[in-house]
């Protein structure tokens, strides 16, 4: 018997083709997508508006399978981090509630190949790309856990950011269909302004993105000059800052999802990239690119060669940029008591080691604390 097809690997259009091949009406795909994503259903028997004969046929050839939660950790600030089981490995998904929204940070790869020196995920190295079902399945599983707001009191997901483990633009074949499902009114129906793809600067893929999908864009810049960026974001050696910003401006010229602006992400590293001179250089780099700048206090991880910028250095950096007229925010660190903060996602390899050590110390698996 051939392997069953996971319907979570299919966009609604692909599912319509699947039903045609089964000799069924394409509208059945619309029904299935609604059942899977609107109602969180993964059991064909519970799909009451689909006749029993078709349900039995589907059970023979298809399945609905999302990653399972291996470990759940809840922060004192409401952030939840899940280690999701994907095959024999794990990736991490983070739920971040705020007063007016709730953002889900989703992984696109097991590990990451880009080797950014300040990021714990990069220290794990790259293992493989996630499939469509493993990406959209993170959203499905999180939505299932969060449940009904009226019952659980947990705010439903309003935004999805592809800012978890991995470089999304190195897995476009799976990331783009997953985002299509996020945007599909029959699935999650998120606005394209509420789905964000983040990249460290894979320029050829970024140039292709507008032909495939229109979503909000964030750029992990982190340095204002090529010499420094070559060191801390090594992909810059291949696609330098000018090449990247030219590509960003091309994307903005055709995108409707960004309000005409890109988000620039900038992790502040003490006495590395957080000086006033760096702020002036950054202002010069961004002067021709409509943007908002998100400054991110660095989140420490074991054996990292960096320190966190002081509040005074962060404030000075922000004020310098604001004097140029930029909109500049400082990201509030969320979930750092469970290593769910930006740059701390390391998945099974590192987390498992840390959890084991804590288990020996405290006799139970607890939220990971910064060392």
Curated annotation (Swiss-Prot):
Note describing how the cofactor binds: Binds 1 [4Fe-4S] cluster. The cluster is coordinated with 3 cysteines and an exchangeable S-adenosyl-L-methionine.
What InterPro entries does this protein's entry cite?
Aldolase_TIM (IPR013785), Methyltransferase_A (IPR040072), RlmN_N (IPR048641), RNA_MTrfase_RlmN (IPR027492), rRNA_lsu_MTrfase_RlmN/Cfr (IPR004383), rSAM (IPR007197)
The protein's name in its UniProt record:
Dual-specificity RNA methyltransferase RlmN
| Residues annotated to bind S-adenosyl-L-methionine | 166-167, 198, 220-222, 299
Which GO terms of the molecular function aspect are on file?
4 iron, 4 sulfur cluster binding; metal ion binding; rRNA (adenine(2503)-C2-)-methyltransferase activity; rRNA binding; tRNA (adenine(37)-C2)-methyltransferase activity; tRNA binding
Q: Which reaction does it catalyse?
A: adenosine(2503) in 23S rRNA + 2 reduced [2Fe-2S]-[ferredoxin] + 2 S-adenosyl-L-methionine = 2-methyladenosine(2503) in 23S rRNA + 5'-deoxyadenosine + L-methionine + 2 oxidized [2Fe-2S]-[ferredoxin] + S-adenosyl-L-homocysteine; adenosine(37) in tRNA + 2 reduced [2Fe-2S]-[ferredoxin] + 2 S-adenosyl-L-methionine = 2-methyladenosine(37) in tRNA + 5'-deoxyadenosine + L-methionine + 2 oxidized [2Fe-2S]-[ferredoxin] + S-adenosyl-L-homocysteine
Q: Which GO terms describe its biological process?
A: rRNA base methylation; tRNA methylation
Q: What is its EC number?
A: 2.1.1.192
Q: Could you say which cofactors this protein requires?
A: [4Fe-4S] cluster
Which Cys-Cys disulfides exist here? 105-342
Enzyme superclass (EC): transferase
Under Pfam families, the record lists:
Radical_SAM, RlmN_N
The entry sums up its family as follows:
Belongs to the radical SAM superfamily. RlmN family.
Going by the UniProt record, its keywords in alphabetical order are: 4Fe-4S, Cytoplasm, Disulfide bond, Iron, Iron-sulfur, Metal-binding, Methyltransferase, rRNA processing, S-adenosyl-L-methionine, Transferase, tRNA processing
Principal subcellular localization: cytoplasm
Q: CDD domains, alphabetically?
A: Radical_SAM
Q: PANTHER family annotated for this entry?
A: 23S RRNA METHYLTRANSFERASE, RADICAL SAM CORE DOMAIN-CONTAINING PROTEIN
According to the UniProt record, one GO cellular component term is:
cytoplasm
Function comment: Specifically methylates position 2 of adenine 2503 in 23S rRNA and position 2 of adenine 37 in tRNAs. m2A2503 modification seems to play a crucial role in the proofreading step occurring at the peptidyl transferase center and thus would serve to optimize ribosomal fidelity.
Q: From the record, give the transmembrane residue ranges.
A: none
Q: What more does the record tell us?
A: Reaction proceeds by a ping-pong mechanism involving intermediate methylation of a conserved cysteine residue.
